């Protein structure tokens, strides 16, 4: 069983015939490429690709995990839905998105990529001011002390 995100569909040659695939309504709305849309529509029509949205509880769990890794601001609603549905179903995620992969790794969810190499290390991100060196929560964009634009810095490597 696999949960697909938009880039997992756009950069793959899935035919939906050999496994059970799921997509959320938000991911479905992101598919605007005509070729990919035709492939997705065919998968839905044949019943090999199912549309399912995650529960609010699993969305909350993913948001909490993404806050801990510092990836929350990098994830779209569709990305969060993909992670939450994977958590809910125990399904493998198909995505080339590094933020999805990082959060999935932190939650011990399985994932694989389609077009590019996946993450090599799992990071926890934080915002640091290059001006005064003060560390900030990931939600901030400017330093509260000196007003300098903050930089994302990998705080620690969780696994190698």
Regions found by a protein language model. Give the residues of each.
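Short glycine-rich phosphate-binding loop at a beta-alpha junction
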Residues: 92-95
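Feature 3881 marks metal-assisted phosphotransfer/nuclease machinery
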Residues: 1-84, 88-89, 99-160
């Amino acid at each position: 069983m696999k949960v697909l995100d938009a880039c997992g569909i756009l950069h793959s040659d899935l035919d939906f015939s050999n496994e059970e695939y799921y997509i959320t309504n938000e991911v479905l709305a992101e598919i605007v490429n005509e070729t990919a849309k035709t492939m997705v529509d065919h998968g839905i029509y044949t019943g090999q690709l199912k549309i399912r949205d995650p529960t609010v509880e699993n969305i909350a769990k993913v948001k909490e995990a993404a806050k801990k890794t510092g990836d929350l601001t990098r994830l779209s609603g569709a990305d969060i839905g993909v992670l939450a549905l994977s958590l809910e179903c125990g399904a493998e995620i198909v995505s080339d998105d590094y933020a999805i992969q990082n959060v999935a790794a932190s939650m011990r969810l399985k994932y694989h990529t389609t077009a590019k190499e996946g993450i090599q290390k799992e990071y926890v991100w934080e915002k640091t001011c290059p001006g005064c060196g003060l560390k900030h929560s990931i939600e901030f964009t400017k330093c509260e002390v000196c007003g300098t634009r903050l930089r994302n810095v990998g705080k620690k490597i969780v696994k190698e």
